[in-house]
Every structure is written in C-alpha cells, then in structure tokens.
Amino acid sequence: MVKEIARKIEIPEGISVSFSQDDVFTATGPLGTVERKLWYPGIKIYVRDGEVEVDAESSRKEQKAMVGTFTSHIKNLMKGVNEGFECKMTILYAHFPMQVKVDGKTLIIGNFLGEKKPRIAKILGETKVKVSGNEVTVSGINKEDVGQTAANIEQKTKIKRFDPRIFQDGIYIVQKP
C-alpha cells in the first residue's frame, strides 16, 4: 500500500506566487520579490486555488523529508515578502571601542582589539544592515541571506588563541531571524 505524501500551504492575502517550468518558485509581496530554485526527483509543486501543494510521487523516506523541506522553504519565502526577517546583534568591547560602519555591500569593523587593519564582513543579497550605537540590525526578505550575513559579521569578530571566557569582545547575535 502506497501512502501519498502531500502538503498544502495557504497563500496569504496580498502575496502572489508562481512556479515556473524551470523549477523556480517566485513569491511577490509588499516588501519585494524573492526567487528560489526548488527541484528534487519525484517532487512536484502545484500552485492552484489560493494554495501551494507540494506532492511526492512515492512514499520513500528521502522524498517525505524533501516535501517537508520544500514546505518550509515556501513558507519562509512567503513570510519574507510579507513581513521580512530581522536579526539583532550587539557590539561588546572592554577596552578598545570598535568603530562599525556600513560601506556598500560590506560592514567595516575598525579598532577591534586595537588592531590597525579593519576587519571586513560581506553583506549578502538585498540584506540591509543598520548600525546604531551598540546595536546592529540585519534585515531583509530572504531568511538565508539575513542569517548568513549575521553569521559573517559574528565570525569576523571571532578571537583565536585567546580564552573566550575572558576576552569577550565581538559582535554577537542576540535575536535570530
């Protein structure tokens, strides 16, 4: 007996979605448009009657897992164009005050632990970074770009060869998207 694996997702008001022949899912909402390629053998995606249906051809374990993964990706895309994602970070230092500023698609961290050379973190995609005092806010419509940009910033202030319990300087994620 073959059990059919399918999940349905309601499309919220004010959001239009489409799924093209080349397996690209597109969501458009008040904050913008975001696209993502969703392909896996045996998985079909249909957009009809105000809902998105993710369907598996067989009941194999891998396909069942991918149905859940695709469902989560689609929900994140629709939430991103409707509400957006925001990640809050805080700047901590003990002795040397850091100068943090945004320059185009990079975040420049100066005077980190008294270093002369600034550290540079990449900002991905359409992500916006705002620095105000000791707070850094990373926001955007793509959850993966927001999370990866926040991780890039946190990694650039990682201290090697020092005890992290004592040397706690850095920029740390306080609230995830």
Swiss-Prot record:
UniProt cross-references to Gene3D superfamilies, sorted A to Z: Ribosomal protein L6, alpha-beta domain (3.90.930.12)
InterPro entries in the record: Ribosomal_uL6-like, Ribosomal_uL6-like_a/b-dom_sf, Ribosomal_uL6_a/b-dom, Ribosomal_uL6_arc, Ribosomal_uL6_CS2
One Gene Ontology term from the biological process aspect of the record: cytoplasmic translation
Molecular-function GO term, any one: rRNA binding
Keyword DNA-binding: no
Source organism superkingdom: Archaea
One GO cellular component term: cytosolic large ribosomal subunit
Record carries keyword Isomerase: no
Keywords assigned by UniProt, alphabetized: Ribonucleoprotein, Ribosomal protein, RNA-binding, rRNA-binding
Quaternary structure annotation from Swiss-Prot or TrEMBL: Part of the 50S ribosomal subunit.
Task performed by this protein: This protein binds to the 23S rRNA, and is important in its secondary structure. It is located near the subunit interface in the base of the L7/L12 stalk, and near the tRNA binding site of the peptidyltransferase center.
NCBIfam families: PRK05518.1 (NF004037), uL6_arch (TIGR03653)
Family: Belongs to the universal ribosomal protein uL6 family.
Name this protein carries in UniProt: Large ribosomal subunit protein uL6
Organism of origin: Methanosarcina barkeri (strain Fusaro / DSM 804)
Lineage: Archaea, Methanobacteriati, Methanobacteriota, Stenosarchaea group, Methanomicrobia
Gene for this chain: rpl6
